[in-house]
């Protein structure tokens, strides 16, 4: 029997526990995960105005793009659980948390009140007194492939190629806007030759943070694009130095303002959840030339959206970050109280259906539960590790 949470559910509190980084790990150019000295994989932002003014072509190097296959670029629980084992080994105890998942999953939930057209399909697995939440990767991949087919069928060859180049520009912007170490440790040639560097989306630096809303504690893993200035030694101060990088088309009319506001809201969701304080947008024209760069402080975005005169009509569509946060709080609290975290005989499917406008939680079939507990989410290594902590 499925249980439903009405879409108008809102928590009374938006009290958020200040996110704190617990540890980090990384993925290298070969797609292998790195657990020792992951800071070596962190990039640093450096893009002076004089460089921006040169009119950088953000589709440059497109034909050489080293793109990771989509199947290998899903939120990977195997690597996260290995990183958790390493952290718990050093701490000598289990991470204190009610929910363990990836930032991108919670971003979908947080942004749902203003993104009612996209389906959500997740698995919730109770284990060792905690809820582990992952995407239904098989269904996600099926949808991605269907979307790709639709893009090809509904666009000319030229238009399809342009759309793929638009996807590339975000990675290109990251490449030309960052350096591998703090500025003082990087050679002039490294800085000047960034535009010639082969772009890839294999390399990732991932931060794992503890946060919470209301009475629920969460551990979230999410990709960090780069560091603003330097990385402090104190673990609990690192989040203030991280930056999210984004690209968007330059804004030339009112309808584009509304479209950008929706993008900015999604970026706010991503960064707010992780405690990332800065978002840098690279704005490009229709020819994919970088025209200007703008810095947004995460904490100021709700006010920017609220005070936008172009969307200030009193409608339900008007984005309200506090309203989204109250929905997120209601979902997290509902999961935490509805699912028995000690019952390891069951797993659940959490589903948002955009056609029925329903948000439901239902038990999976026993076969699915077995798969999730034996490699698809939980790994034998992690299960054994947690058992050893009880001895």
Curated annotation (Swiss-Prot):
Q: Whom does it interact with, and what assembly results? A: Interacts with RAT1; the interaction is direct, stabilizes RAT1 protein structure and stimulates its exoribonuclease activity. The interaction also stimulates RAI1 pyrophosphohydrolase activity, probably by recruiting it to mRNA substrates.
Q: Which UniProt keywords apply?
A: Hydrolase, Metal-binding, mRNA processing, Nuclease, Nucleotide-binding, Nucleus, RNA-binding
The positions annotated for binding substrate are 223, 246, 270
According to its UniProt entry, the protein's GO biological process terms are: cleavage in ITS2 between 5.8S rRNA and LSU-rRNA of tricistronic rRNA transcript (SSU-rRNA, 5.8S rRNA, LSU-rRNA); deadenylation-independent decapping of nuclear-transcribed mRNA; mRNA processing; NAD-cap decapping; nuclear polyadenylation-dependent rRNA catabolic process; nuclear-transcribed mRNA catabolic process; positive regulation of termination of RNA polymerase II transcription; termination of RNA polymerase II transcription, poly(A)-coupled
- Which of the seven top EC classes does this enzyme belong to? hydrolase
**An example Gene Ontology molecular-function term:** metal ion binding
Protein name (database record): Decapping nuclease RAI1
Write out the catalysed reaction.
a 5'-end NAD(+)-phospho-ribonucleoside in mRNA + H2O = a 5'-end phospho-ribonucleoside in mRNA + NAD(+) + H(+); a 5'-end (N(7)-methyl 5'-triphosphoguanosine)-ribonucleoside-ribonucleotide in mRNA + H2O = a (N(7)-methyl 5'-triphosphoguanosine)-nucleoside + a 5'-end phospho-ribonucleoside in mRNA + H(+); a 5'-end triphospho-ribonucleoside in mRNA + H2O = a 5'-end phospho-ribonucleoside in mRNA + diphosphate + H(+)
Database matches in InterPro entries: RAI1, RAI1-like_fam
Which Enzyme Commission number(s) are on file for it? Answer: 3.6.1.-
**Location within or outside the cell:** Nucleus
In which domain of life is the source organism classified? Eukaryota
Q: Indicate which residues the UniProt annotation says bind a divalent metal cation.
A: 174, 225, 244-245
Q: Which cofactor does it need?
A: a divalent metal cation
Which family does the record claim for this protein?
Belongs to the DXO/Dom3Z family.
- Comment on bound cofactor: Divalent metal cation.
């Amino acid at each position: 029997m499925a249980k439903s949470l009405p879409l108008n559910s809102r928590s009374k509190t938006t009290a958020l526990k200040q996110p704190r980084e617990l540890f980090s790990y990384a993925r290298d150019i070969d797609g292998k995960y790195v657990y020792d000295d992951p800071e070596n994989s962190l990039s640093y932002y450096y893009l002076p105005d004089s460089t921006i003014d040169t009119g950088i072509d953000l589709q440059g190097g497109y034909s050489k793009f080293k793109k990771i296959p989509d199947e290998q670029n899903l939120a990977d629980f195997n690597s996260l659980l290995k990183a958790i084992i390493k952290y718990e080994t050093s701490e000598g105890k289990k991470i204190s948390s009610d929910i363990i998942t990836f930032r991108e999953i919670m971003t979908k939930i947080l942004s749902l009140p203003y993104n009612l057209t996209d389906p959500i399909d997740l698995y919730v697995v109770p284990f060792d007194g905690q809820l582990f939440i992952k995407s239904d990767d098989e269904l996600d991949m099926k949808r991605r492939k269907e979307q790709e087919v639709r893009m090809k069928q509904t666009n000319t060859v030229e238009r399809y190629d342009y759309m793929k180049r638009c996807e590339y520009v975000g990675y290109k912007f990251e490449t030309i806007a960052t350096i591998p170490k703090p500025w003082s440790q990087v050679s002039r040639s490294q800085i000047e030759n960034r535009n010639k560097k082969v772009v890839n989306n294999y390399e990732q630096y991932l931060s794992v943070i503890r946060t919470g809303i209301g009475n629920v504690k969460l551990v979230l893993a999410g990709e960090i694009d780069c560091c603003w200035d330097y990385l402090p030694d104190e673990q609990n101060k690192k989040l203030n130095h991280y930056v999210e990088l984004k690209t968007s088309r330059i804004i030339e009319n009112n309808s584009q303002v509304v479209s950008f506001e929706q993008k900015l809201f999604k970026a706010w969701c991503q960064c707010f959840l992780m405690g990332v304080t800065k978002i840098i947008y690279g704005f490009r024209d229709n020819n994919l030339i970088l025209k200007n760069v703008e810095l947004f402080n995460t904490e100021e975005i709700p006010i920017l959206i609220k005070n936008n005169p172009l969307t200030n009509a009193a409608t339900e569509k008007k984005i309200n970050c506090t309203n989204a946060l109250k929905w997120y709080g209601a979902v997290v609290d509902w999961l935490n109280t509805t699912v028995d975290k000690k019952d390891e005989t069951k797993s659940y499917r959490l589903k948002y259906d955009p056609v029925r406008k329903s948000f439901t939680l239902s038990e999976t079939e026993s076969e699915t539960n077995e798969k999730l507990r034996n490699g698809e989410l939980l790994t034998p290594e992690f299960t054994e590790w947690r058992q050893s902590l009880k001895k």
